[in-house]
Amino acid sequence: MTLDLDAHKKDDKLLITTIQQEYKILAEYKMIESEKLSGIYVIPSYANSLQWFGVFFGRQGLYAESVFRFTILLPDRFPDDKSLPTIIFQQDVIHPHVCPYTHSLDVSHAFPEWRCGEDHLWQLLKYLQVIFSDPLDSIRGIEVDKLKNREAAELLMNNKEEYVARVQENIKESKEHIFDTPPTEDPHYIVFEKFQQDVHGPVLERIKAGRSKQTEPSAQQGNGGHATGLSWVKEGEFKPLSIE
């Protein structure tokens, strides 16, 4: 009987810990919504809140017009663990801070460790936005040997023309795969559809008129209140249509 009681107490404690973690993760998502980061859309997986789906739209600089999908993996004890969240791109992305083998983004130069209550996911996404806006400035003061992609750093500093050409290859590839079939059946995976006048035209007109009640793709709701991750892109362009 004592063993049964101890087991129940352990299960109850685990349940409470899990619920508390879910609330903390939800709070992180709400903060991201309130920050209204331009060109970055993220949403937690429906099946696992420790896995997030994201898309980065380059708006300026060398990476303008890029559409890079990425995944965020949170540590098991997030946000209480000092371990850093992991951002992994789904394709080759040439950048001094992106590993050419794993496609993971090195955030350790901005976040040596995760400080619960001080560091937040919106700051991580803002960092992603900043380093793509000005990659050269992002490596200023950092030894080349400490960068994830030394070759990219050397090209950026010494052969910018070749670096730009490599970036353009990445951008071209990203656009070619924007409408690919989702690699997962998770309903929160961010999906983009080609513009269809009969389906999306009326919505576009409401947006233009300032009457649209839609939220951005990272928080679109459907299926009984659950976010579907569904968005759409105007034909000939590679950015989601929104009120922004």
UniProtKB/Swiss-Prot annotation:
Biological processes annotated in GO: defense response to bacterium; sperm individualization
One matching Pfam family: UQ_con
UBC core domain sequence ranges: 20-176
Region of interest called Disordered, as start-end residue ranges on this chain: 209-244
PANTHER family, A to Z: UBIQUITIN-CONJUGATING ENZYME E2
Family per similarity comment: Belongs to the ubiquitin-conjugating enzyme family. FTS subfamily.
The protein's name in its UniProt record: Protein crossbronx
Organism: Drosophila simulans (Fruit fly)
